[in-house]
Each structure stands twice: as structure tokens, then as C-alpha cells.
Amino acid sequence: MLGKDMKMEEQNAEYVQEFLDNEIVRLGELIEEYKANVKVMGEDFNMDNPNGGMYSGMELTQIHHEMEKQFIYSEEAARDAYFYKKLRKAPYFARVDFKSDRATREKTIYIGLRTLQKHDTFEMLVCDWRAPIASLFYEDFPDKAFFKAPSGEIRGDLLLKRQYKFENGKLKYYVDSDLKIDDDILRDVLSSSSSEHLKVIVNSIQREQNKVIRYSDNENLLVIGPAGSGKTSVGFHRLAYLLYQNRTELSSAEIIMFSNNDIFSSYVADIIPELGEMPINYSSFYNIFKAEIPTISTGDYYSLAESIINGDSRRSKSAGIKLSKDFVAYLESDTDVCEPEFQDITLFGNVIFSKEALLERFLSDTENSQKSRGARLAAYTQGVIDEYFINNREEIYLHIDADSEIDEDTAKLFKAKRRQIKESAAEMIKSAILVDPIAVYFKLLEKYAEENNCPELLDTMATLEKGYLEFEDAIGVVYVKSVLGMAAVLSGVKHILIDEAQDLSYIQHKLILRMFPRARVTLLADTNQAIISELNTTSKEELAEIYNANILNLNKSYRSTKEINSYALKLLPEEKRYEIFERTGEDVKEISGNIEDFKNVVKEMAENSPSTCIITRNLKETIEVFNELKTEIDGLRICDNKSFELSHNPIVMPLALTKGLEFDNVIVYDKDGAFSGDENKKYLYMAATRALHRLTIFNCKSELKSEN
């Protein structure tokens, strides 16, 4: 859309592009200068250099530190240059004209991914989307506009809200909007193809999403939203916003994102750097297992999900108990099932403190962890030893040197003996309380199973003999280790983002709180997408209670076309349905046929768009489909929870691994009604909402066989 101001807008775009070009050149020269400096200093630092011996050790240390600084400056300049090159494609995406009630003239603010400011004149060319004044673009104001600045609320008149479309650095058009981000531009954004990585959405953030992003960093936040509502993107944009707002208090290294799906972690890994920040940390509970119980192999969340999806009701019941709130309380209340084996503290054949008395005192102290109780017992024991030495001084002197009078040397030996007894007692107590958390966990499990008549809880004990722990047992072991005070406490982590929070069990959430006691938490959840709802904390009220979190709702889905969204909504109970953004596309296809028909459908869809995913109910079916199609479909890949990177090649995946991902085209492989029936509607809903543009449900009657 061309307007009367198009010439002026083109001139402004060229002005900003010129600034970027100059900055890229300047940064390139700086990088070369830093490299040259490092080279010169490196020659001086080389001791083989004839002049190397001229420097003292302190001077060489200073040279080394200066070289490190030059390396850091060079890396920072390189990052800035890289980012400026990206900004050349679209230096900004919006403009607002605002007249504050305090000002006499209006102010024009261009908004982009990053602040662009001239070094000499301090002229602000582009304002960072995270700046307080930029919030004017994302909000709707029926009356006076306002934004929250550090100095307080600034009120005034919003005179213009304008959006821009750039293509390869050239301004194509702009659109003026009175109230909200223009739907045509939003449709344009949503109509684009899927990507191997989560996309930056700063140019299309909606009002309710903006509220989540800019929410207070002093409180825990639970974000509830349907599939396609932008929860994950909003969560990461919130992290970028918090980093921008708290430069001196929060760094990327102090943030961690938790997910049950390692493939999803790779999908989102680039978004924080794309938003101009250093990468954050990513983890899963499987990584925690490797750190806390490294001597034993463990299952992951996906292996448990596969068992439940495949109908293993016995394991479902067992895991449901092990991951529950009641079992957590049981683990916390009785970790003394493996009593410490204390030894008598003796001196010259006399018992100072008996092992029975040590155990009795230890068991009578029920506050805090076993490690803390052991420390208190050790401190108490030191006092008992001191008192014994004072009360039995003469007898001890006789044992030390019966033939000599008490002199200075004897007194020194007396003190040395007391120190020796105290040190050995402290070491004995420390060793005694270092119980095996695996042994403690399984003793507790046996006790609980007997008390509650749940023999199925012990089914997984057989795997321990093979050096393997199932996921639900590994979580329990690490939790017991934490209760005992033996697990890591990562106080340096200040913020945690938990994606698909509804897929984490009660015990997982509680373990996060124990291991990261200083961290604020942002949780992203959709209770309609609990992959194994029998095991998980699916109530948003319960999630909020665990973290003492406030709840914000995202009520509209943007990902899929109107046709796909309408199909998915019919799979949900009426009370759980949500708003959709209307973007029209192709009708959803429901096809029945044999294996040859299935091959033809996949071929046709993959030829039209490589971003095609065939979603199966489980891993067994994934392998069957892949083996049947691998010679028919060019570049077909299989995702089976091993090392995997997403690409634009067609792919076959089991349902559990598709959580959080999106594809242009989705074919749901409904083998013999695997996704049919009321009990399977939630699985079909999860699969259907992975599709952006085209969705096909294929009911295949032919029997496929997996190859080993």
C-alpha cells in the first residue's frame, strides 16, 4: 500500500541503511585493529622473542590480560557486525508518533529488533522493541495512550501507528493502523513457511502476548494458551525482554530452559541470539539424571510416554503413583529407612559416645536434610569430646605419659590427642550419613508398596539389577538425593523457562524448586495437550499453587488455517474451545485406503512442500512407515529420539516427539483407528495442531512390518 508519505519513508529507510553500511565498515576496521593488536602483543608475549626477556612476570601477566580484552572486544564487534548485516534486510518494522502531555511537540519513534543510534550526535534512528516507549505499538488505547517509563507513567496522544514491509532491504509498503497490528500483515506473517527453528515475532506480537512478555520479573508466571497461541515464542521473547530490562542483574548464563523434548530444545536454541542476546542454557531431566546419578543408565520421559501411549496400564498406574503428590510427601517424611552405621567414639578403650547414642540423637533430629542433621550431630559430638577430655584430664595424662610429670610437652600431646579424636569422629559421622540414595529410594518404594498393597510399584526393580533405572524411578532417586541434602543446589540460576509444563509431573516441579531455590519461573502450558495426562499436573490451579505463580491466559490460536483450527476444535469439549485467527486455506482431508494410496498421498504432499511431517501414534509405527517409504520419498528422514536436527526434508515422527513443533503439511497416519474414538481425541488434537497449512488424516488398513 502506497501512501502520500511514501517518498519520505523511502528516504528514511535509505538513511538508516546508510548508517548500517557505515557501521559494518567501521566494525570491520575495528576487528582488524583488534587482531593486529593481539598479534603485536603475542609477539611480545613470546619468550623466544629476543625482546621477550625484557618483561617481568607482572608485565607479562598484564600483556596476557590485555590480549584477552582485545579478543573480547573483537568478538563483540563481530557479533554487532553480524547483527547489523541481518538488520539491513529489515532495519525496523513499525513507527509510532506520540505526543506526551508534558511535551509541546510530537515524537516519531521507529521500532526494530535493536536500538540504532549515532555515536557522534546520539540521534536515535531505531528504538529497541523492548524499550518502554515501544510498548505503544503493541497496545490498544480506547482513550489516552500511555507507557510505563522508569520515571513513572507517561500519558499522551498516540497520533500514528504504522507498520512496514521490507524485502531484502527495500521498503515495499507501509500500513497505517488505528487500533491494532494490521490483520493483513499478520496474515502475511502467518502464511509463510515453517522453519527449522522457532521464529522471531517482534513485528506481530499481539496485545495479550505483549502483556506476558512485559510482565513483572519479580513474580512467577504461568502462561496458559491453546496450541498455536504463540506460548513458546512469547516465552522466549519474555526472556529477551527481561535481559534487556535487567542488564546489570541478569545475564543469559543465569537463565535455563527446561523441556522434556531434546529435539524441541534444538528447535528453539537460536531464538535468543536472533533477538540480540547471548545464548541461554537448555536442559532436561535426562541431563539432571546424568549429572546426579552418572554411574547408572536411565530412561527418559519419551520412553515412559511411549509405554503409556501403547496401552501399558500396569506401568501407567505404577508411574502415576511414583510421580504423584502423595508419594512426594512419603519420600520427604521417611528417608531414615537406611539408618547410618555409626561407630563408637573411643579413647584408650573407653567409650566417649556410643554408636547407639549417636544414632538415637541423629534420629531424634528431624529438621532439614540428612546432611544438615549430620552436621549438627558432628558439632554436638565435638562438644561431648571436649567435655570428656576436661572431666578425665588426669586419666588421659597418665595414658599419654605415665612416667612423667605434667609439663608443657604433655599438655601439647593432650591437645593433639583431643584434636585427633575430634577429627576422626567428624570424618566417621560424615561417612556414616553418606547413604546410597538409590538404596534409600527402593527401600522406601518397597515399604510404600507393602503399606498400600501396590505390588506393581516393584516391577521396575528388575531393571536396577541390569544397571538401568526407568524414568519414573530416576526422578524418585534424584528427589531422595535432594531430600538427603546430597543433590546439587544451583543458586546461580535466576530465571527458568519451563515449556510444556503440563507434561511435567508433580515430583518434577517440586524437584525444580529444590534445585533452583533462587530462580524466578515462567511456565508455559496447555492442559489440552497433556501427552500422558494420567501422570501429570494438568490443572492450571495446581501448577500455579506449586510455584505461587500468577496466571495469564492467551485465548487465541494463530498457527493454523481456519479449516485446520476448526477441525481441531471439534476434538475438544465445548468448554475448552478457544478463539482462532481467521486465515483461510485448504479443507482438511480424511482419506481411507491401502498402503499404495498412502504412498501416493505422501509423495504428492512432499513434492509440493518439503516441510511435511508424517505423525504416527508411536515409535513402532514410525519405523514401519519409514521402512515402507524410504525408497519412495527423496530425503525422507526418521526421528526416533536419537541425535536429530530438524530440516526441510520430509520426516516421520511419533506423536510424543512432535510437541511444540510445526510443519507446513501434516499427514496423520491413523493405522487401524489408532487416532480414532473418544479416548484418542486428545492425541489427534495434538497431531492436527502441528499443521500450518495442510492437514490430511489417512486411515490405513494395510499391515506394515517393522525391520530390525
Predicted regions, residues:
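A structural signal for short, well-ordered beta-strand segments and their strand-loop junctions
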Residues: 95-97, 163, 222, 234, ...
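Alpha-helical nucleic-acid-binding subdomain
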Residues: 243-497, 503-511, 519, 528, ...
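Extended, charged low-complexity regulatory segments
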Residues: 1-202, 206, 210-214, 708
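P-loop NTPase Walker
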Residues: 2-34, 188-304, 686-689, 708
